[in-house]
Every structure is written in structure tokens, then in C-alpha cells.
């Protein structure tokens, strides 16, 4: 930086790398496009799988956009931002992670010629936001309502989601599992919190072995625990269940406790006191005549002995999340102290308590429950990799089912909605004046990336198919014409039963266009060395390559 012809003043550290203006914007566009090209081949039913080596040396085989991108380590900040998009999409609606990355990359590419021609990013961003508003209006206009009480209609929508996955061969099975699980959770009746409740109360348990057809949704829960004593009952019909969040052990001192014993009877007295205390705790439980006691904390040998004498089965150190699910299926209330237990806290809704040995581990099943509001989804499969991919596919399917129940509207898949919105934007672009018209029209062309990618992954002639598709959408009455993902043929998506939830589609458009706008507004990228703490005694600190890291000044508490 020069000032008045004098010596340059260095404001930034010499190690700092800085890109600004057009150079930074073009670098962001290139990084975004590079990330989107990674997942392009994983879109649609004819998608390819990616094999990734994770940092621990394990292998991940998947075509799930979010699962691929979270395993990839990138340096460019714009690329990191793109990867974050897939995570947000997965968190919000569970599906459409690949589509959102492809579309965001295409939106960035569409802006490149305008940046090169020195059109100000604010003009591009304004046009993009206007195109987003028009797109949302058109999508909502094209949406078709669905009857959520009709399982056939919901299954058709779910099969479109699972049809693009590795487990598409077992599509019917996985859609049935997802639908049954969501209907079980919905008995709680809170649609607004359905997303949170599915994560909390629908637990996927993976057990290697068996075949995929052995997978099932339990009308209850299962967890990986055994009873604490081999003589306790492993099979109980209609058990009375008590759930605790406290240890059944003699209370230990808060800090270091010293006990001074003056005579030989003191030891006996101390042990006697412990036995009486535990007997009192157990009696508080036993007066409610339970069959099963489950606690999140420990159970001492003495407490086990007292409970075993009354034929009570005990399970200890259960996870908090598992205990919450057991509470929902058994009707029991989790109690913090044994003396506070009341008759209304005892669970009576569970029909069968059973501990089974599967492989070399014991699993506890609490099934045949009356109107359970939580469930366990048991997945069986040949190997760990297959089970992990099944779980990812089931997660997407559960999310799509949740979206359908929350917002029961569908839009056509197979790129039909993109082509129809593209055609609509193209028509109204002529009414936009000034420079805004060019980026607005660019959004229309960028939307064609989805049908183009579908055609490309099918191995058909992309140019011919997209030209034909564009011509059909410019005519009236062809709103639902798209590309059939398996054959690459141009088909009516309504007849082919390829549907997507409107919530997923709206989220894809909003996330892709808004993130592209955010990245286009960046005109300066500064990257430098981070602050490092100096080792005690003033010795210099070295990084992983043995290079000395310069000392940093200021108090460590400065943040």
C-alpha cells in the first residue's frame, strides 16, 4: 500500500495470503463448481457410488451427497461453505443434498460471464433473489395435494426418494419401515416437533447377519443390554416396569471421606448401616410390585440380591435416550428417587419383556406395547458397509415421510419442475428492464442442470433430450414432463409416479440460490496463520512439520 508516493506501509502480516475483487469472486466460483462436480454422478436412479477412505482407515461406500462431502477435506473457504450446504439440507429436510450442491454450483457458474464483464455482483444478486421469489410462487402453484391417510399415495412419494439410492431394490421394504416408524411417532400428536421427535424416538439398531428382508419396525423398543444377574427372568409377559434415574447403591461421599474406626465392631456397624440403607431403597421399589426395574445408573450386588429375592429383573446403565424411549412405550415415568415412586409412575403398557442372544451379544426387547409412541427399527444385513448405507437411505426416507406429513403436497420429480420453472422464468425475463434481465435469465438456464445431470447419468444424448424437453415445456399442458431416471426417456412424471415433497424442493431452491448470492457478494478472501500458544518456559512451539511457530503476544484470556 503506497501513501502519497512514500514507502509502502505493510498492514497485513507477510505470511497472509489475500485475494480481492474479481480474482476472489472467480476463485469462489471455481471452488464451488469443483465441489458440485464431485457429486454430479451421484444424482438419480442411475447414480454411481463413491468409495472414500475416512481418517480412521475405514471405507465409506455411498451415493448420499452429504455423506460423501463430509468425508472430504478441502482448503478453500468457498468449498467449505458448499459442503456446509449439504449438511444444512440434510439437517432441515433430510433429502435433496446432491441436488442442492449441483444447483448451487450451477448458479455460481451462471454468474461467471457477468463477473468477467464487470457487472456488479449486487445487480446479479438482486436478479437472483427475484428469480427465487418467482420460482417459489411457480412451485407452490404446481404442487399437488396428497391424502396422508392413504398409504398407497404416501408410499409412491417415498419410493421416488428411495429409487435413487443404493437400496432401491428393496424400496418397498424400506418405505414400509419408514412409514410405520413415522406413524408410530405421530401418535404423540405434535406435528410441529415431528422432526425432533423422529431423531429422538425412532432409533435405528444395526445388527450384522441375516438378510435385509429380516428388517422390522418393533411395536416397542430394543436396546443392547442384559439383565444384571443370570438368575433373573429373561421372559416376562405384561411386566410392571419402573424406570429410575438414580443409582441403587450406598451413597458415596461428595469428596474424599475418611472413616476412623476405633474398635472391631465399627466395621460391622458401617456395613450394617449400608445394608439397611439399601434395604430401605429396595423396599420403596418393591412395595409397588414391579417385574422389571431399569436404571440409568449403577446397581450394587446387595441391591441385586434384594430384588432377585422378589423375582424382579434389573437392567442398569441404560442410556438416557433409551430410557426416554422405554418411557414412551411402557407408559412409565422416569423417577429420580426410589421413595418418590407412585403407582401412576409404574408402566403397564408393555406386553412382553424379553432378553435375546443375537450373535454374541444380548439385546433386550420390550414389545407388544399398547399404542407405543416410540419405536426401534432393526436393520439386518450382510456386512457393516451395507448396514451403514441402509441406515443413510432409511434416514432420508424417514425425513421425506416427515415432510409429507408436515406439508402434504407433492411436486413432479425427474427434472420436470426445474424445466417448468425454467420455462416460466424465461417467459417473464423479457419484461425485466436493464442489466437485471441477463442474470435473471441465467437462473432459468442454470435450473436445467438437474434434468441435464439425470440424462447424463443415464448415458443418453443430453443435448437432444434437453432441447426436446424445453420445447415440450414451452407448450401448454406439459407441466409434468421430465426425464425418467432409469431409461433417460422423456415421460410424464405423473404417470410414472415420480414425486417429491414440496418441502424438499423449496429448501433446495432457497439454499442453492441464497448461498450463491452470499458467495458472490464476497470480494475479499484473506487467509493467514492462526494464533498459536507458546509453550511454558518460553520455548518455541513447532507445528507438525517441525517448523517453528512465531510467538504471539497478548494474554491467552483475550480469546
From Swiss-Prot:
Cystine connections: 369-375
The organism's place on the tree of life at top rank: Eukaryota
Chain segments annotated as coiled-coil in the UniProt record: none
Gene3D superfamilies reported for this sequence: GroEL, GroEL-like equatorial domain, TCP-1-like chaperonin intermediate domain
Primary localization: cytoplasm
Purpose: Molecular chaperone; assists the folding of proteins upon ATP hydrolysis. Known to play a role, in vitro, in the folding of actin and tubulin.
Subunit structure, interactors included: Heterooligomeric complex of about 850 to 900 kDa that forms two stacked rings, 12 to 16 nm in diameter.
Protein name: T-complex protein 1 subunit gamma
Amino acid at each position: 500500500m503506497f501513501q502519497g508516493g512514500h514507502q509502502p506501509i505493510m498492514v497485513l502480516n507477510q505470511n497472509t495470503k489475500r485475494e480481492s475483487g474479481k480474482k476472489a469472486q472467480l476463485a469462489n466460483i471455481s471452488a464451488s463448481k469443483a465441489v458440485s462436480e464431485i457429486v454430479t454422478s451421484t444424482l438419480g436412479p442411475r447414480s454411481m457410488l463413491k468409495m472414500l477412505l475416512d481418517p480412521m482407515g475405514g471405507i465409506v461406500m455411498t451415493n448420499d451427497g452429504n455423506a460423501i462431502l463430509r468425508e472430504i477435506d478441502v482448503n478453500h473457504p468457498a468449498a467449505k461453505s458448499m459442503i456446509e450446504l449439504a449438511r444444512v439440507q440434510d439437517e432441515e429436510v433430510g433429502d435433496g443434498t446432491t441436488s442442492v450442491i449441483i444447483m448451487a454450483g450451477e448458479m455460481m457458474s451462471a454468474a461467471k460471464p457477468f463477473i468477467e464483464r464487470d457487472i456488479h455482483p449486487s445487480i446479479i444478486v438482486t436478479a437472483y433473489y427475484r428469480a427465487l421469489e418467482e420460482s417459489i410462487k411457480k412451485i407452490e402453484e404446481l404442487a399437488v395435494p396428497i391424502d396422508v391417510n392413504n398409504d398407497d399415495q404416501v408410499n409412491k412419494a417415498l419410493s421416488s426418494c428411495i429409487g435413487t439410492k443404493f437400496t432401491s431394490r428393496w424400496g418397498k421394504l424400506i418405505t414400509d419401515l419408514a412409514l410405520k416408524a413415522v406413524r408410530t411417532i405421530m401418535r404423540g400428536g405434535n406435528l410441529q416437533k415431528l422432526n425432533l421427535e423422529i431423531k429422538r424416538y425412532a432409533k435405528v439398531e444395526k445388527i450384522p447377519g441375516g438378510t435385509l428382508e429380516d428388517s422390522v419396525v418393533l411395536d416397542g423398543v430394543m436396546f443392547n443390554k442384559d439383565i444384571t444377574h443370570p438368575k433373573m427372568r429373561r421372559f416376562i409377559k405384561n411386566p410392571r416396569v419402573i424406570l429410575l434415574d438414580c443409582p441403587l447403591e450406598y451413597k458415596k461421599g461428595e469428596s474424599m471421606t475418611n472413616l476412623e474406626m476405633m474398635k472391631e465392631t465399627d466395621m460391622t456397624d458401617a456395613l450394617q448401616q449400608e445394608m439397611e440403607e439399601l434395604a430401605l431403597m429396595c423396599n420403596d421399589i418393591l412395595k409397588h410390585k414391579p417385574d422389571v426395574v431399569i436404571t440409568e445408573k449403577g446397581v450394587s450386588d446387595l441391591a441385586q440380591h434384594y430384588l432377585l429375592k422378589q423375582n424382579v429383573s434389573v437392567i442398569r446403565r441404560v442410556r438416557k435416550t433409551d430410557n426416554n424411549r422405554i418411557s414412551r412405550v411402557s407408559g412409565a415415568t422416569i423417577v429420580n428417587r426410589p421413595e418418590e415412586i407412585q403407582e401412576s409412575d409404574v408402566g403397564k403398557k408393555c406386553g412382553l419383556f424379553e432378553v435375546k442372544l443375537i450373535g454374541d451379544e444380548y439385546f433386550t426387547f420390550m414389545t407388544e406395547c399398547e399404542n407405543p409412541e416410540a419405536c426401534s427399527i432393526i436393520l439386518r444385513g450382510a456386512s457393516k458397509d451395507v448396514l451403514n448405507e441402509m441406515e443413510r437411505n432409511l434416514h432420508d426416507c424417514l425425513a421425506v415421510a416427515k415432510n409429507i406429513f408436515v406439508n402434504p403436497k407433492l411436486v413432479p420429480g425427474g427434472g420436470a419442475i426445474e424445466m417448468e420453472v425454467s420455462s416460466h422464468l424465461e417467459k417473464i425475463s423479457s419484461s425485466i428492464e436493464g442489466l437485471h434481465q441477463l442474470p435473471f435469465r441465467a437462473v432459468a438456464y442454470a435450473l436445467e442442470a438437474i434434468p441435464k445431470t439425470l440424462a447424463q447419468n443415464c448415458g443418453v444424448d443430453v443435448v437432444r433430450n434437453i432441447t426436446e424437453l424445453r420445447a415440450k415445456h414451452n407448450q401448454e399442458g406439459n407441466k409434468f414432463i421430465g426425464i425418467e431416471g432409469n431409461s433417460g426417456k422423456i415421460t410424464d412424471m405423473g404417470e410414472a409416479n415420480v414425486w417429491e415433497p414440496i418441502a424438499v424442493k423449496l429448501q433446495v431452491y432457497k439454499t442453492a440460490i441464497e448461498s450463491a448470492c452470499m458467495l458472490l457478494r464476497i470480494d475479499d478472501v484473506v487467509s493467514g496463520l492462526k494464533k498459536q500458544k507458546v509453550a511454558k518456559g518460553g520455548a518455541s512451539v513447532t507445528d507438525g512439520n517441525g517448523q517453528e511457530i512465531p510467538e504471539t503476544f497478548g494474554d491467552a484470556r483475550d480469546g
